[in-house]
Amino acid sequence: FILCLCCALTVAQATGEDRLNDSDANVFGHVLDKKTGEHLPFINVLLKGTTIGTTTDNSGHYFLKNLPEGKFTLEYKALGYKTVSKEVSLKKGKTLEINVELEEDQIALDGVVVSANRAETSRRLAPTLVNVLDAKVFTTTNAVNLAQGLNFQPGVRVETNCQNCGFQQVRINGLDGPYTQILIDSRPIFSALSGVYGLEQIPANMIERVEVMRGGGSALFGSSAIAGTINIITKEPLRNSGELSHTLTSIGGTSAFDNNTTLNASLVSENGKAGLYLFGQNRHRSGFDQDGDGFTELPKLKNQTVGFRSYLKTSTYSKLTFEYHHMNEYRRGGNLLDRPPHEADIAEQLEHSIDGGGLKFDLFSKDYKHKWSVFTSAQNTDRDSYYGTNQDPNAYGKTTDLTVMAGTQYAYSCLLYT
């Protein structure tokens, strides 16, 4: 109710504010690579502490118009480059030209993280050590899901504990999987039931970055964060783009294949006030028998995922964000995979249907020093299962799990422009 009321009040307020916001205070310029001198496309240009931002176009140029008056900081950031900040004084009817050069960042210390203190903080200034897996790591390693990407993070190990069903758990500092808290967009909706097979169910193409914080974080994230915290940040729309890809991988050089098809699309309105990012994945992996004994070492998988993340800037000082994902997965391990599970000697078969999402409303004060957020997230998991041996007809089961959370957060920044 509070969230709906806030949105209604803000939308009602937005029209009047937009009329008053024709300040004609503008900033334009270009962004260059410091080493090569080439123009850089798709660089994020943000007015720090606000919801205002854009990206450079194909020629490396950008334009921000009708900005609020006052002293602000412009940030220029992109994957693989050090963040550059420029102080600006915006005045009514004045247009500024600001050109910048970006330098490659080999160790990614200038990235922004949210897992250290629940607020956006430069990784360099974060009070605790936060390691980041970005989208580049998933692409370079050809990882198709979260589990495959986490293997490239120091101090983190993903291990398979069952050859029949392929159950995987993540270990941080040697502790078992239940001692690690997994978050989606900083929300603890990834339940114990989802966590059993969830590492393979989250596709890489929905992930913007993964923040890994090793060590206890119970004060911030609850009693499950004893070994550490893994925070999955989903992708936001940045520019109009689309991508369709398919990979075919032979498992062990045999006739068992892993087929993976992904779809991504990003749509942003011309004025930058609304955006939508769509993602989808269809994966099929054959069951794999390494030693020829008739029992699988890797289970058969069929996985379909679809979802989106969108935002709407309801005014200059407010933003509404919505995320949704749907996952279907079938997995079967054991022997005699072409028969019903109760006719096999050993069989573990699971069918998952997962629906989850979140809604967040951010409201800033006019000087952007005060920020108030209201949020809610939920995830529902339905699982049909069979765990049995010796052709047991009574080994079928069904499990349902619903996780819902809601909250509010207030933040005050006393050093907004430094």
Predicted regions and their residues:
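Short, acidic, small-residue-rich periplasmic hinge/interaction motif at the N-terminus
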Residues: T15-D18, D22-D24, H30-T36, I43-K48, ...
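Short Pro-Gly-centered beta-turn/loop motif in secreted/extracellular proteins
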Residues: G37-L40, F63-K71, L79
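Short, acidic Ser/Thr/Gly-rich low-complexity loop/linker segments typical of extracellular
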Residues: T50-H61
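Conserved small/polar residues in nucleotide/adenosyl-binding loops
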Residues: Y417-T418
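Flexible loop and strand-edge segments within Gram-negative outer membrane beta-barrel domains
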Residues: R285-T305, Y311-K313, Y317-W372, A378-D401
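Short acidic/polar hinge/loop motifs at secondary-structure boundaries
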Residues: K65, Q169-R171, R187-R214, K235
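Extracytoplasmic beta-strand/coil segments of soluble accessory domains associated
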Residues: A147-S191, E208
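Outer-membrane beta-barrel translocator/receptor signature
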Residues: S191-L193, M206-E208, A219-N231, K235-G292, ...
